[in-house]
């Protein structure tokens, strides 16, 4: 059957059943699991001395082969205008160091095509980060869409390549890289205006700022009082409870807090006093 009409018309000829098959391939539990375990999508990857060069494909080979077969079947049946392309609009990577700031070392991160035997960077999509520059955010934008084809014994696909340099005396992890992207597949392809890889240095988080406000100081003092009498762990911003030594009761320092219904209990008539006799090791006068 010869092609007739536009490629859009040919694409629309694909049956709903075939489209459902493609959705099952892309969103099956196995595919989602492999995107995490084999591609590290949205996960933190630690760079160690024994993993100095890391290559992470942006689509698992199993999923890529199934998608390529789906497009090939539609192409040979005359329903699709091509054997399929993988489209990656952008790759974002958050990089943080996991060693002291004066450690001598650097990271080279770039986007590559697994169809290239030398695995060279694609159109200046490469960034070098020194340890002292971290943390940082980097971004990559491919200038073309990748054909769904076999090159030798592997599927052609975009990949993030990370190389660790230096860091003598640091055999463990020296940096953490968390990457995110959204692969798309289409029967059409395009070329894109070249844009250099982006690099944005991020100011380290100032966690001391949380302790500079008056309310933070009050919470700190109350937590210190609480720690002297009871090894309770208190979440930030929650009501702080004080436990008396030698007593099973707990008294809230914030008297305005309303107790939920399940915390309200009836005091026994045999009780001499509802207040503890000893608080923080100081005996309360007038108690038995």
Curated annotation (Swiss-Prot):
One of its GO terms (biological process) is transport of virus in host, cell to cell. Pfam families: 3A. Belongs to the cucumovirus movement protein family. It comes from Peanut stunt virus (strain J) (PSV). It is found in: Host cell junction, Host plasmodesma. One of its GO terms (cellular component) is host cell plasmodesma. Transports viral genome to neighboring plant cells directly through plasmosdesmata, without any budding. The movement protein allows efficient cell to cell propagation, by bypassing the host cell wall barrier. Acts by forming a tubular structure at the host plasmodesmata, enlarging it enough to allow free passage of virion capsids. This is Movement protein. Its main location: host cell. Keywords: Host cell junction, Transport, Viral movement protein. InterPro entries: MPV.
């Amino acid at each position: 059957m010869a092609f007739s009409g536009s490629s859009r018309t040919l694409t629309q000829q694909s049956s709903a059943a075939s489209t459902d098959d493609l959705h099952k391939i892309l969103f099956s539990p196995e595919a989602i699991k492999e995107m995490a375990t084999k591609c590290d999508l949205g996960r933190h990857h630690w760079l160690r001395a024994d993993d100095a060069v890391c290559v992470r494909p942006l689509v698992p080979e199993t999923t890529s082969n199934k998608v390529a077969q789906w497009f090939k079947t539609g192409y040979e049946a005359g329903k699709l205008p091509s054997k399929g392309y993988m489209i990656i609009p952008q790759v974002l990577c958050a990089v943080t160091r996991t060693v002291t700031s004066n450690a001598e070392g650097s990271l080279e991160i770039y986007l590559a095509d697994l169809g290239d035997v030398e695995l060279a960077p694609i159109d200046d999509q490469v960034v070098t980060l020194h340890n002292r520059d971290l943390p940082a955010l980097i971004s990559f934008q491919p200038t073309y869409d990748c054909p769904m084809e076999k090159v030798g014994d592997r599927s052609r696909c975009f990949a993030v390549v990370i190389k660790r340099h230096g860091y003598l005396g640091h055999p463990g992890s020296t940096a953490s890289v968390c990457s995110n992207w959204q692969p798309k597949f289409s029967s059409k392809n395009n070329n894109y205006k070249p844009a250099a890889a982006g690099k944005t240095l991020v100011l380290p988080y100032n966690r001391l700022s949380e302790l500079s406000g008056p309310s933070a100081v009050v919470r700190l003092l109350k937590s210190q009082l609480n720690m002297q009498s009871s090894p309770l762990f208190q979440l930030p911003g929650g009501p702080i409870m004080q436990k008396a030594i030698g007593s099973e009761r707990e008294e809230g320092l914030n008297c305005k807090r309303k107790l939920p219904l399940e915390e309200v209990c009836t005091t026994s008539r045999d009780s001499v006093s509802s207040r503890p006799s000893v608080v923080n090791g100081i005996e309360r006068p007038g108690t038995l």
